[in-house]
Amino acid sequence: MKRLFTLITIALLALPALACTNLLVSKGASKDGSVMVSYAADSHTRYGTLVFMPRATYPKGEMLEIREWGPGKFLGHIPQAEKTYNVIGNMNEHQVLIGESTWGGREEFVDSTAILDYGSLIYICLQRAKTAREAIQIFTTLADEYGYASSGESISFADPNEVWFMDIIGKKPKFNKKGRMKTREPYG
């Protein structure tokens, strides 16, 4: 019985280790006035992944194919931006950084009709935003227009001047409330 209890305890303690981890530091909280975000994608399926998306220009009316981050399942199309920025990892050429921590949620609230999952939204925003505020605006506008196809996520947005934190969760199709909340991290 003692052995079984020990095994169950170890298994339960290991569960939190499956979550991604972000640490956010605002300009006023760092000694030298730097904004810092650390992001550990604790997913065993993404170790070693380093995304690279070169800056590009596209013809007006071009459509962007959306595939679910990870499994690669086709979700739909959205209009492509005419100009995109260079992205390496989770940062773009304007030093906009986006990270995430998955916390889940009720499966019945994941919108099965939605086109954009959290990973697609992160990389689309990095390709299109010059500031953290602009990334949040793009993220929320696209999620409102095309639906959010993931469970609960805490999204970290940063640029050289600000750091923001936003929670978002899926909503049933045609559910009338927005499933998100954002806050700016305090200066100090």
Q: What is each stretch, according to the model?
A:
Residues 2-10:
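Sec-dependent signal peptide recognition
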